Amino acid sequence: NGILNKQSINILKNNPKVNKGYLPYTSQNLLNSAFKFLNAPYGWGGLKDSVDCSSLLFNVYRTVGIYLPRNADDQETTAGIIVNLLGMSADQRKVQLGASNPGAALAMPNHIMLYLGQVNDEPYAIHSLGSHCANGSRQSVMKVVISDLKLMKSDGNTYLNHLTHACEYR
């Protein structure tokens, strides 16, 4: 009928799941937001209520008021503290990642992940993963997962060795 009505709703003020405005920019808030996507279905371009790697980061950082570009390769070059990992050995990359804050983005060609931290000197990330290689064949995953960076690409190198940059957006 073309009439717009204004409607008020009552939201509990002490509900920890509700925040007025953006959440404070902290590693904990980034990780809490990311973990809400754990096991969500992978879908290229975020089709049909799914998330791909870049939409995961886009959605997580949006909760703290940072609007990232939509695509992983563009997110890699967005303003912030960017650490170049190219040309580093695996051990050097682990040292650099150990100096990064949880919630930093980890970029490699055509993929981006959210850094969680290290366990026994092994870096871990949460990311929306379509597949990886194991025992010489493609392993379908198709969901948001937590993994170390020992996962293999089709060329036989690990995700750790494919990393190009660690990015802390500001």
Model-derived regions: residue spans:
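...with weaker cross-activation on analogous glycine-rich loops/strands in unrelated enzymes
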Residues: 69-136
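N-terminal capping segments
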Residues: 1-87, 109, 126
